[in-house]
Amino acid sequence: MQRALSSRTSVLSAASKRAAFTKPAGLNLQQQRFAHKELKFGVEARAQLLKGVDTLAKAVTSTLGPKGRNVLIESPYGSPKITKDGVTVAKAVQLQDKFENLGARLLQDVASKTNELAGDGTTTATVLARAIFSETVKNVAAGCNPMDLRRGIQAAVEAAVDYLQQNKRDITTGEEIAQVATISANGDTHVGKLISTAMERVGKEGVITVKEGKTLEDELEVTEGMRFDRGYTSPYFITDAKAQKVEFEKPLILLSEKKISAVQDIIPALEASTTLRRPLVIIAEDIEGEALAVCILNKLRGQLQVAAVKAPGFGDNRKSILGDLGVLTNGTVFTDELDIKLEKLTPDMLGSTGSITITKEDTIILNGEGSKDAIAQRCEQIRGVMADPTTSEYEKEKLQERLAKLSGGVAVIKVGGASEVEVGEKKDRVVDALNATRAAVEEGILPGGGTALLKAAANGLENVKPANFDQQLGVSIVKSAITRPARTIVENAGLEGSVIVGKLTDEFSKDFNRGFDSAKGEYVDMIAAGIVDPLKVVRTALVDASGVSSLLGTTEVAIVEAPEEKGPAAPGGMGGMGGMGGMGGGMF
């Protein structure tokens, strides 16, 4: 019996060693780094990438134009999301095939970059990228030099952008601003007027934010305040986990030009916050070490509402901005020149404000309690420095930013609706419209509906001088691709794209503003009809799309992680061994 048990023990020991040696799952980081890859070359690689690009583009382009369709996206929490926003649709796509997903992810990058730079035009960028890449793939497969194709594409894009810049129109009136916003909000005139009103109230350099409202109607709130591009120093300060931001009502503000690391420096401010039962926001060059640890600990224990933010700017500019904040909040700025140290702080030295919102990237201070006279005096002081002939252009730019933040207001558009889904969809449209309007004010407008790109195809590429035949093909690819947005808009309206685009590029080629209103189904002067696109949006979409898609065309090898191989199933429990009458594992 003893011999059988020892024999069985040795068998189990050997089995466990083998299992440990061949264990397929739970690879550590070092093992994963050396996991084998899967490669595809040449035509096969580009075909797979194109398949992924086509799949994503098909989903995104269905939203383009006044009669574009909505897309329903599953949400990991809450209700599904309904949207017509191109970048939202693009980001939601994840393909099963890894090579196809490579192409889709590059197109997602195009959409995201365009959205980041221009705030709109993501669907147009997707349409252009797909058109340029698909034609590039065909020509490379036919034997063209991909690098020459890319050079031709880049030359044509530069010529098209020059043509658009020569024919742009600056916008000045509130009516034109409303038209741009209306188009970007998919024809919603109410949203257009709301954004136009907000821009009039805070000025073109003012700050406008969009939030989800709690009523059925949209609301516009304009409040005096300041925004700067610094966020919370630690995510532990977040009060709204879903929105990933800190929101305080009536906080106290501690302003310091120096780094804060010692606990003694913040104890008086923390005590004042506790005594007055008000949140505390520390704005300093930096907060670190024990001081930061104490703030986080107090916040996590729920003993104190506190947050820390790095002061905006650098050097002298930081000192000036902190001075602005001091005037705005009626607080003392602790500097090297000030005789009083932080540990001697009294509650009356802390600034105060109506509310503050802090995200990862920026901070908005509303209703600062500084006196109107002090703020006006500070603004005059800034204007005086700007008027000084010795002030450089760079310094004037920074001073203008400070003046706008100090004298301008903050407009908050609260989007209303009957349900969470409706409010979410509408908020996407309002954000798009706001971004497009800012872009239009910045660089001017063009006739919308893809018309400007159509006219660039007809008239803007005549002076491009390619060095060889392959570069000429690159120019032809762009000439064809930039007609695609207009064609897609028309086709999404259920009309024949080829006929209408043909008429616009032949009969109306010399009339820059003449285009097709897909909503009404008629040829009109697009500017007069209020159908416009910001130059910045069109330019950014074209440049980003051509850059990535022509680079994709030069791809010769695609490499992805190979799928994990499933190892053999772990051996089951040892049943009774032969002749042992099924002695169970209970003996071990």
UniProtKB/Swiss-Prot annotation:
Q: Where in the cell is it found?
A: Mitochondrion
Q: What CDD domains does the record point to?
A: GroEL
Q: Where is the signal peptide?
A: none
Q: Which family does it belong to?
A: Belongs to the chaperonin (HSP60) family.
Task: Report the InterPro entries cross-referenced here.
Answer: Chaperonin_Cpn60_CS, Cpn60/GroEL, Cpn60/GroEL/TCP-1, GroEL-like_apical_dom_sf, GROEL-like_equatorial_sf, TCP-1-like_intermed_sf
Keyword terms:
ATP-binding, Chaperone, Mitochondrion, Nucleotide-binding, Stress response, Transit peptide
The answer to whether keyword Mitochondrion applies is: yes
Any GO MF annotation of the entry: ATP hydrolysis activity
Q: What organism does this protein naturally occur in?
A: Emericella nidulans (strain FGSC A4 / ATCC 38163 / CBS 112.46 / NRRL 194 / M139)
Q: What is any one of the record's Gene Ontology cellular component terms?
A: post-mRNA release spliceosomal complex
Q: Where in the sequence is the transit peptide found? A: 1-34
| Encoding gene (name) | hsp60
Sum up the protein's function in the record's words: May participate in assembly and/or disassembly of proteins imported into the mitochondrion. HSP60 are ATPases and have affinity for unfolded proteins. Involved in osmoadaptation.
Q: What is the lineage of its organism?
A: Eukaryota, Fungi, Dikarya, Ascomycota, Pezizomycotina
Q: Which Gene Ontology biological process is one annotated for this entry?
A: 'de novo' protein folding
Please identify the protein, giving its name as recorded.
Heat shock protein 60
